[in-house]
Curated annotation (Swiss-Prot):
SMART domains, sorted: PGAM
Uppermost EC category: isomerase
InterPro entries: His_Pase_superF_clade-1, His_PPase_superfam, PG/BPGM_mutase_AS, Phosphogly_mut1
Gene designation: gpmA1
Function of the protein: Catalyzes the interconversion of 2-phosphoglycerate and 3-phosphoglycerate.
Name the UniProt record assigns to this protein: 2,3-bisphosphoglycerate-dependent phosphoglycerate mutase 1
Length: 237
């Protein structure tokens, strides 16, 4: 048996302000920092140690991981950051308050992009500064691979090769793995691990700052999963 720990970053400024964040680099709020500290304490108390940690290119996930490892007193794990673990890209909605987005684009299109697996948000213009292809930190990536906006399905498809080709082999080698990422990316991983249906996925909630522990068999099939702060099986926050 091996363990895998999934953690959604602590509350960000955009979470607090009710904005679509996506690839926008919103920092943690003081509450988000406390959530990261609490997660670190829970993992330390449970005796967790990590050989390798995976996270996105976004500061709210990076800072959550940094705080967790500091609280745990762990400076030695390898940390790999990759854009494929970035949050779902919200296209033209990036950085916009949800109510403003509804007023601009209409209630039904916004609701559809939030509740339907295959519904993308309104796309960005490629000339928009919010397009990752126009940002220096993604300059080494083929612009054709970078999103102008993503449905849930498209975000999962972008993440999946990294899970299969990079993260899974580390788990199979017996490495103790922590993934600090984002709501939709973690939902995609949970869908993959647990074989959830699309209907089950739509109902799935992943709380900020709560470590979700998976116990896996030799074939990486889940034996059970539970939150570190409750020990209770389940995903909802």
């Amino acid at each position: 048996m091996t363990q895998l720990v999934l953690l959604r970053h602590g509350e960000s400024v955009s979470n607090r302000d009710g904005c679509f964040t996506g690839w926008g680099d919103a920092p943690l709020t003081p509450r988000g920092e406390r959530e990261a500290e609490q997660a670190g304490n829970l993992l330390k108390k449970a005796g967790h140690k990590f050989d390798i940690c995976f996270t996105s290119e976004l500061s709210r996930a990076n800072d959550t991981l940094r705080i967790v490892l500091s609280v745990m007193g762990q400076d030695e794990p390898v940390v790999q950051r990759n854009w494929r673990l970035n949050e779902r890209h919200y296209g033209a909605l990036e950085g916009i308050n949800r109510w403003k987005a509804i007023r601009k684009y209409g209630f039904c299109p916004i609701l559809s992009s939030q509740c339907r697996f295959d519904a993308p948000p309104p796309p960005l213009d490629p000339a928009d500064i919010r397009f990752p292809g126009n940002q220096a930190c993604y300059a080494t990536i083929d612009p054709g691979e970078l999103p102008l906006g993503e449905s849930m399905r498209q975000a999962f498809a972008r993440m999946l090769p990294y899970w299969q080709q990079t993260i899974t082999p580390e788990i199979q080698r017996g490495k103790r793995v922590l993934i600090v990422a984002h709501k939709h990316i973690l939902r995609g991983l949970i869908m993959q691990l647990d074989g959830l249906s699309i209907i089950q996925l739509i109902k799935l909630s992943v709380a900020t700052g709560r470590p979700l522990i998976y116990e896996l068999d030799d074939n990486l099939h889940p034996i059970r999963h539970y939150y570190a702060d409750t020990g209770l099986t389940g995903h909802t926050g």
